[in-house]
Amino acid sequence: MKAQPTLIALGRIIGVHGVRGWVKIHSECRPREAIFNYSVFQATRHHHAQTLKLLDARRSGKSLIALFADICDRDAALQLNGFTLNVTRADLPQLKNGQYYWTDVLGLTVINRSGEHLGKVCDIFETGANDVLVINKDGQEYLIPFISERYIDRIDFENKYLYVDWQMAWTDDAD
């Protein structure tokens, strides 16, 4: 039996646009429009999956909208609401040595220079100045600036560890 490829979520269908089958897209890509560099998505919602082929896409005001093959009217578009738009790892552009995707960092165990386990990376977000890691430990979340050579010592993807120069005392919510 062939193993299923790991899917990487690039965005989500969040609504309809007009009456001709267009849908609104929330993109997790940076820049947002990069989601339209892909022509085929494995769309998933709960236990349902289907392949969607992109026919056309554009900005509409502040929104991103897309038209998929065989989605010809508003009713068909409404059926897609809530679907996550995924691609396989093989569909992503090849990275240079030392580069990685955010999805690779999610779930890593964070360890500081003292060997203290700080939790797991549960999210990453942009601030404009730098990206920020959201770390979850025992249900409590705190933030670490994602700045290489300042707070990030190294990433060990093989063993799923992220080593940081960070002390819990620097976190306002630390006990």
Curated annotation (Swiss-Prot):
Location(s) in or outside the cell: Cytoplasm
GO molecular function, one term: ribosome binding
RNA-binding among keywords: no
Disulfide links within the chain: none
InterPro entries assigned: PRC_barrel-like_sf (IPR011033), PRC_RimM (IPR056792), RimM (IPR011961), RimM_N (IPR002676), RimM_N_sf (IPR036976), Transl_B-barrel_sf (IPR009000)
Protein's GO biological process: ribosomal small subunit biogenesis; rRNA processing
Signal peptide limits: none
Domain of life: Bacteria
Keywords noted in UniProt: Chaperone, Cytoplasm, Ribosome biogenesis, rRNA processing
Annotated ranges, domain PRC barrel: 97-170
Subunit structure, as described in the record: Binds ribosomal protein uS19.
PANTHER family linked to this entry: RIBOSOME MATURATION FACTOR RIMM
Comment field on protein domains: The PRC barrel domain binds ribosomal protein uS19.
Family designation: Belongs to the RimM family.
Role: An accessory protein needed during the final step in the assembly of 30S ribosomal subunit, possibly for assembly of the head region. Essential for efficient processing of 16S rRNA. May be needed both before and after RbfA during the maturation of 16S rRNA. It has affinity for free ribosomal 30S subunits but not for 70S ribosomes.
Protein's name in the database: Ribosome maturation factor RimM
Gene: rimM
